[in-house]
């Protein structure tokens, strides 16, 4: 628990003591103490509606309750300098800022661990994201899903969850047959032979190149093989090459995975059949018109779903149910899926499926990644200038850069449409949010270098009493919020809460820098204290940026 959290907890405890001392409630009737951080600085550091909550129990007007409560509050123990009662009975608390100085040694000691909390308590969580079909390049939706998914994993881990990152490889569907047929056509064409592309073929440049590579390496070897043998090889070859490309792009984008899970393995290990048997034994299926149906309407779905078609083949839903059962059988207590915008209607049937298998519907959360629109020179970008094709993750990394792409994708709520201004993302101005926050970090590093050159050293035991200005306290309060922001972002699964925070921290730093002199040639003690504050700011900025996969440059 960091200093700000300690102060908050101490205040909660002192409010409970004051409520009981004023005779307003007992242990049995006292409500939970809710402390919020007001949006307006004039309303204090913390505020509570406790007086309104107690009105029914105490049978008094909230303002009167607020007066009686605050009269009994031990301000010194609660580290409170001033209290104001506002409106119908809100109680606004203003901290004794001198206590905030203790935040600095806490951050300096923690370094990269600053911001860690234990709200997750080691709970096993699996996040499955990207999971693009291995049949082409990663597009904008996949790129946004990768940025959001990785940031969420980082945040969950920082908040004390045991996180596993998984990519589900769709390698068993008809799309892999189409990949093999497309590769076959490109292979024949590379040999100068005529071969039509399949109706649902893949026309990407990558497939053309794979065909050329095969022709160059193997010559006409596969022409003389049976179609069955040839397509079996092309399936395996095409899948391997596509996955290599996807893995390479994601690795460059700083998105690691702990596990790559093959859909095919669900069939080869008999897991799909086992899951079907479980559903049958539980009475969750029935036969109709030669097909096997899942009673998903029992769990709120708008209609029952087919699991096995009348020709004996499985629907897409069947292996997906088996896959989710397997996740639980691997010991995960919570599943988070990050899906594209076109999967919204799929959520009720998956929640129905896990309930039918005996799990709680809240054990599965699904984040929907909304569409991305690119803009350049004020106009919507539909095609890449480099390839003339749809814009890919690789195009964005090359044209905009990894940091800007990661930050912009994490900057808005995942379920809201994102307009991505490519000109803004590469501009070196304060209007560019990623430049603004990275420049804040570089600026702090510059101050720290200057202090070192002047021999102004500091450590955890440095005298911090010279820190006394309003701007310094504003910065300390903002630094102190970080662990709570991490906890909130994890619990609400909101990576954009981190980008909002880091922008606020950068803004608070710039405000301090414009108002105060960090290094005062006439006051070494003040300079050392302020440099310690700068180091705490630098650590917090870097830690926050790392959560969304963005680097913190020391020079710009």
From Swiss-Prot:
GO cellular component: cytoplasm
GO biological process, one term: arginyl-tRNA aminoacylation
Disulfide bonds: none
Chief localisation class: cytoplasm
The EC number(s) this enzyme carries: 6.1.1.19
GO molecular function, one term: arginine-tRNA ligase activity
Top-level taxon: Bacteria
Keywords: Aminoacyl-tRNA synthetase, ATP-binding, Cytoplasm, Ligase, Nucleotide-binding, Protein biosynthesis
PROSITE patterns noted in UniProt: AA_TRNA_LIGASE_I
Catalytic activity: tRNA(Arg) + L-arginine + ATP = L-arginyl-tRNA(Arg) + AMP + diphosphate
Name of the top EC class for this enzyme: ligase
Motif extent ('HIGH' region): 132-142
Name this polypeptide is given: Arginine--tRNA ligase 1
Organism: Halalkalibacterium halodurans (strain ATCC BAA-125 / DSM 18197 / FERM 7344 / JCM 9153 / C-125)
Lineage: Bacteria, Bacillati, Bacillota, Bacilli, Bacillales
């Amino acid at each position: 628990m960091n200093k700000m959290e300690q102060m908050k907890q101490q205040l909660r405890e002192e409010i409970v003591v004051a409520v009981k001392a004023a005779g307003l409630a007992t242990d049995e009737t006292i409500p939970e103490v809710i402390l919020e951080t007001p949006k307006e600085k004039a309303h204090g550091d913390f505020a509570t509606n406790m007086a309104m909550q107690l009105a029914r129990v105490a049978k008094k007007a909230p303002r009167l309750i607020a007066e009686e409560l605050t009269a009994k509050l031990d301000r010194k123990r609660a580290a409170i300098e001033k209290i104001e009662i506002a409106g119908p009975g809100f109680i606004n608390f203003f901290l004794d800022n001198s206590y905030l100085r203790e935040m600095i040694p806490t951050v300096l000691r923690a370094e990269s661990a600053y911001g860690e909390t234990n709200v997750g308590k080691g709970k096993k969580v699996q996040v499955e994201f990207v999971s693009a079909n291995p049949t082409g390049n990663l597009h904008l939706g996949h790129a946004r899903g990768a940025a959001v998914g990785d940031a969420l994993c980082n945040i969950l881990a920082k908040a004390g969850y045991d996180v596993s990152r998984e990519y589900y490889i769709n390698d068993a569907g008809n799309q892999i047959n189409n990949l093999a047929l497309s590769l076959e056509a490109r292979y024949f064409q590379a040999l100068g032979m005529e071969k039509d592309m399949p109706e649902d073929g893949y026309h990407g440049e990558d497939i053309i190149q794979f065909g050329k590579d095969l022709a160059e390496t193997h010559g006409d070897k596969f022409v003389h093989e049976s179609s069955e043998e040839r397509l079996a090889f092309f399936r395996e070859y095409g899948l391997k090459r596509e996955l290599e490309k996807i893995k390479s792009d994601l690795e460059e984008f700083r998105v690691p995975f702990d596990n790559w899970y093959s859909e095919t393995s669900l069939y080869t290990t008999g897991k799909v059949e086992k899951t079907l048997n479980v559903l049958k034994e539980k009475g969750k299926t029935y036969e109709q018109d030669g097909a096997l149906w899942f009673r998903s309407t029992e769990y709120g779905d708008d209609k029952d779903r087919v699991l096995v078609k009348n020709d004996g083949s499985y629907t897409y839903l069947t292996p997906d149910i088996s896959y989710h059962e397997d996740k639980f059988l691997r010991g995960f207590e919570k599943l988070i899926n990050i899906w594209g915008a076109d999967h919204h209607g799929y959520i009720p049937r998956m929640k129905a499926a896990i309930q039918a298998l005996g799990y709680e519907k809240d054990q599965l959360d699904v984040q929907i990644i909304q569409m991305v629109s690119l803009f350049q020179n004020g106009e919507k970008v539909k095609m890449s200038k480099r390839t003339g094709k749809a814009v890919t993750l690789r195009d964005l990394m090359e044209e905009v850069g990894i940091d800007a792409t990661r930050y912009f994708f994490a900057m808005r709520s995942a379920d809201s449409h994102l307009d991505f201004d490519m000109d803004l993302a590469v501009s070196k101005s304060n209007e560019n949010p990623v430049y603004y926050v990275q420049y804040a970090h570089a600026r702090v590093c510059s101050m720290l270098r200057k202090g070192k050159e002047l021999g102004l050293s500091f450590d955890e035991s440095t005298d911090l009493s010279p820190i006394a200005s309003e701007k310094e306290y504003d910065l300390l309060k903002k630094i102190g919020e970080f662990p709570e922001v991490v906890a909130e972002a994890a619990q609400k699964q909101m990576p954009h809460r981190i980008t909002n925070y880091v922008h606020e921290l950068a803004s608070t730093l710039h405000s301090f820098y414009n108002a105060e002199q960090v290094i005062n040639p006439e006051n070494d003690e003040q300079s050392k204290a302020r440099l310690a504050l700068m180091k705490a700011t630098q650590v917090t900025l870097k830690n926050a940026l790392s959560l969304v996969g963005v680097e913190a440059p020391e020079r710009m």
